[in-house]
Amino acid sequence: MIAAQWKIIGNSTYIKKEIYSMSWDVDLKQQVSVGSPFAGPIAVMRDSSKFVEMNSQNMKPYLKIFTASGDLISQMIWDSSKNIVAMDWIEKERLVIVLQNATVLIFNVFCEQMTQFSLGDIVREEEILECKIWSDGIVVLTSASQLYSVPSINDFFVESGRVIRLPPLPEEPKARPEWAILEPQFSLSQSIEIFMSINGTLYLIDEDKVESQLEATEPIQKMVVSPCGKKLACFDTKGTLLILKTDGSTTNPDRMDTKATKSPVLKWCGSDGVMMYWDSIKDPILFYFSKGDSWAKFTLDQPVSLVTEIDGLRIISDTTSEFFHKVSDVTIDIFKIGTTSPASILYDATDHFISKSPQADESIRSINDQLEDAVNDCILAAGFEFNGGEQSKLLKAASFGKCFLENYNPSQFVTMCRSLRVLNAVRHHEIGIPLSIKQYYHIGIEELIDRLISRRKHLLAWRICDYLKIKSDVVLNHWACTKVRTDIPDQELGKIIIKKLESVPGISFANIASAAYLAGRSKLATKLLEYEPKAAEQVPPLIKMGESGLALNKAIESGDTDLVYLVLLAMQRSLPLADFLELTFSKVVALDLLISMCKQKNDFPLLREIYHIKDQSKEMGNIYLQEALSSHPSQLDQRIKAYNKSIEHYHHSKDKDDQATSKFIDDQIKLEMLQKELETNLQDESFVGISINDTIYKLITMNQPKKAQSIRSEFKVPDKRFWWIKIKALSIMNDWEELMKFSKEKKSPIGYEPFVEVCLDQKNQIEALKYIPKITDILPKIQFYIQIGYFREAADIAFKEKNFDLLNLISRKCTNNEILNIIEQMKSQIRR
């Protein structure tokens, strides 16, 4: 009877049930063992601090990983020179081992090293005093009384991991401080927080600050945070267990005086209570404490290893694995001795129905109003059971009860049946994942599938996916990636993988091909990539495998120019130039894109090579010209050489425009040589490379009018352009006298408006007034007068021209009343 196994502790009911008879041959008394939560594997290693009788089995130190049922998953010989300071599991069932030299090693369940990193030279030099590992990080305390934190181990898998130095301790510890970690998901700061007992005071330390939490009367020897993150169990030097709140709101903590002189192993049982374990005495004992007077003692006949779960505690010994947890309310309602709950009556009614007793009908009638609740309770109770027979009885009771209900929604019943079928499959001794229903709902089906495939239980994972009607591509992908590391011949293995996966949607053949290539199976990898439907996934592995031609074909077929560019860049880096160009010239699209890429990157040598092969003189000329213009002005010899090469290729072209271009380049050579001469004579290195206009302008501003005139004559600069350049330069120099002289040399070919404009640009209205009268066009002359505020002069011109519209324009701009009156008089006279 189920209730016979229960133990009443305070106001709650608990049960310690055997889940497995362990398959291993392990003496936990001589081993260090750590179990992964959520029914995870157990890592075992010989305890180097204990004397062990040597035999053939333990001559060498081994790291062994077992399932929760004690089946060996993997093992490896451990290098005894690597001194371990901490070993524990993090999420995704990864085993973390921290060494004394500050090296961190990460292993999967097959003892395969996934990655490693260092905590840094400073940590190594200060020496690790103590280290604690949490679900995604590490915290170490050094001999220098300094804390260091790894906020995320997963970040080291993507090379973005970091080690943080935490604030210094608030006082020098007189003895080694005890501490516990509050994980980020439970802290207000959303980063790790550390509870540390130093000299009788409890402090809270985060990445930025240290705060005092509690003035304790006795130093704390052990402390541990509950799975929910809300409670902190502390065991002090007087043998008292205290339960505090992590938010600092504790006023009257729950306590238990054990009178023990030695500190126990402290482990939470879910978040309900704390299990204390003393293994250093003749008969190991467990003490469970919840609150008030709620406690219980369990005497053991062998050492155990404890693993905290969110809803209980795994108690692992040399021979058994037990699960200690609180009995659910629905289970108590159904199986408690003397119970008359509706669910209990329904459960009994089912037995009566099976035995064809008329009492079944009476029982159903008696709970008719509460039948739906009874059905739901039986469904829930089935979920809490590990025994398949008891699950079946409870589900039969629920099924029997719902037959008498109209419009009952069976979704809860169906979901529970499916969940239990999955759970029973993974709980099987050969699989060894004894998840409770609460743990299963907490991690979710995706995480469970991930755990199965990481243990290479692909068939079971696939069957679960198929049963639950969820995507199985992840399972099959991992199966194939594992398969390529076997010794099956390439051709045979290729057929096996393709036959199995070809029709499965969402499969990434690229991932499998990459795994095959890493396993040294290039031919198999190439064959598998032919079945990858996505070109973006297909091309990069082909490049990595050196299949440049195939990669180029696939990239071109995809129509994705970015992919083609990717292949071209990879080919350029890895192939000899001749092979690269031969392969590229065989594909017109690739060649066009290569030319475009070279132009964007100004890769002139490669462009010259391409155009030389294509015998395109004009393009060769363009490249040499572009190369000359883009080279630095100080490299004149190089520029001239490129100009001459350009002319040489343009001469081979039959295009008349190219012949004209040759003449322009000749002039450019002549100009740059003159500019170089100017740089030498004037000791100014900023001439070469600028235009003719800029050269003349610069010479004028440097008071070199004769040299400017010489350049003008040499290159036949038109009068209009020269006048524009000179008046601009003289105005910038504020050489108004020279500007006036220049305006009188001869009639201006550009008129006198530019003279006014440059004066006004320099905000010199007085000089501008000298040139406005010389303007012949009436409108610009009036506009300039308006611009500088000479409204009367503007009005006189408009009146002289008898232009009524211009007078109106002036009056709109003018604000002087006297002048406005004059303008009105002028307008009156014009009207007459």
UniProtKB/Swiss-Prot annotation:
It is found in: Endosome membrane. GO terms for molecular function: actin binding. It is a peripheral membrane protein. One of its GO terms (cellular component) is actin cytoskeleton. Keywords: Endosome, Membrane, Protein transport, Transport. Its main location: membrane. GO terms for biological process: endosomal transport; intracellular protein transport; vacuole fusion, non-autophagic; vesicle-mediated transport. PANTHER family: VACUOLAR PROTEIN SORTING VPS16 (PTHR12811), VACUOLAR PROTEIN SORTING-ASSOCIATED PROTEIN 16 HOMOLOG (PTHR12811:SF0). May play a role in vesicle-mediated protein trafficking to endosomal/lysosomal compartments and in membrane docking/fusion reactions. Belongs to the VPS16 family. This is Vacuolar protein sorting-associated protein 16 homolog. The gene is vps16.
